[in-house]
């Protein structure tokens, strides 16, 4: 019996704004800039790349290139895309384990 494998696209499962926000939050927790960019690209595809392009003023090609696995978007582009996605970038103090009394 031959097994047929299909490519999994996580964008297909990101159907709610909450799921998209959690997906991006988890990507940021990895502290891997390339993975964060890729995750934002996945969420942008889930939301609709044309819609994101229209809201940011960036071309679809620029978005695909910037938020690919090898992309390196500028902070300006990242903030614009996150705003278009309805995801807020926030900062919290980092609590180091060795500083806990």
What do these predicted ranges mean?
Residues 57-73:
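Recognition helix of helix-turn-helix/homeodomain-like DNA-binding domains
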Residues 57, 80, 94-101:
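Long, contiguous binding/interaction regions
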Residues 36-55:
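Short basic helix-loop element that most often maps to the first helix and adjoining turn
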Residues 75-92:
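DNA major-groove recognition helix of helix-turn-helix/homeodomain DNA-binding modules
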Residues 1-42, 98-101:
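N-terminal flexible/basic segments that precede or flank functional cores
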């Amino acid at each position: 019996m031959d097994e047929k494998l299909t490519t999994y696209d996580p964008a297909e499962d990101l159907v709610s704004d909450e799921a998209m926000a959690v997906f991006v939050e988890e990507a940021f927790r990895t502290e891997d800039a390339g993975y964060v960019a890729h995750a934002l690209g996945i969420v942008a595809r889930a939301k609709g790349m044309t819609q994101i392009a229209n809201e940011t003023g960036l071309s679809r090609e620029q978005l695909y290139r910037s938020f690919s696995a090898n992309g390196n978007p500028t902070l300006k582009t990242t903030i614009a895309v996150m705003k278009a996605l309805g995801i807020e970038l926030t900062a919290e103090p980092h609590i180091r384990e060795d500083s806990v009394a």
